[in-house]
From Swiss-Prot:
SUPFAM superfamilies: Glucocorticoid receptor-like (DNA-binding domain). The keyword Iron-sulfur does not apply. Pfam families: zf-dskA_traR. Keywords: Metal-binding, Zinc, Zinc-finger. Gene3D superfamilies: DksA, coiled-coil domain. It comes from Escherichia coli (strain K12). The keyword Heme does not apply. This is Uncharacterized protein YbiI. The gene is ybiI. A zinc finger (dksA C4-type) spans 39-63. The lineage of its organism: Bacteria, Pseudomonadati, Pseudomonadota, Gammaproteobacteria, Enterobacterales. PROSITE patterns: ZF_DKSA_1, ZF_DKSA_2.
Length: 88
């Protein structure tokens, strides 16, 4: 039984929407193109095993770790489920 304005499957739709957003964000972070032999940040050689494991890699392990630490944590806020986004 639906209550208010939400349909019976609104919770599942919200969960699926959140998952789809996370997948799209993760796919957007995948490197593309040809792997570099040297790190574009520090110039250190990128090991062959890393280049084979991650096609399109552009950073050495150390620089990638530093970049990952600087990345803001994902808050989990879903704008599609926000009242404000629906009122505008």
């Amino acid at each position: 039984m639906a209550s208010g304005w939400a349909n019976d499957d609104a919770v599942n739709e919200q969960i699926n929407s959140t998952i789809e957003d996370a997948i799209a964000r993760a796919r957007g972070e995948i490197p593309r193109g040809e792997s570099l032999d040297e790190c574009e940040e520090c110039g250190a050689p990128i090991p062959q095993a890393r280049r084979e494991a991650i096609p399109g890699v552009r950073l050495c392990i150390h620089c990638q770790q530093e970049k990952d630490l600087q990345k803001p944590a994902y808050t989990g806020y879903n704008r599609r489920g926000s009242k404000d986004s629906q009122l505008r």
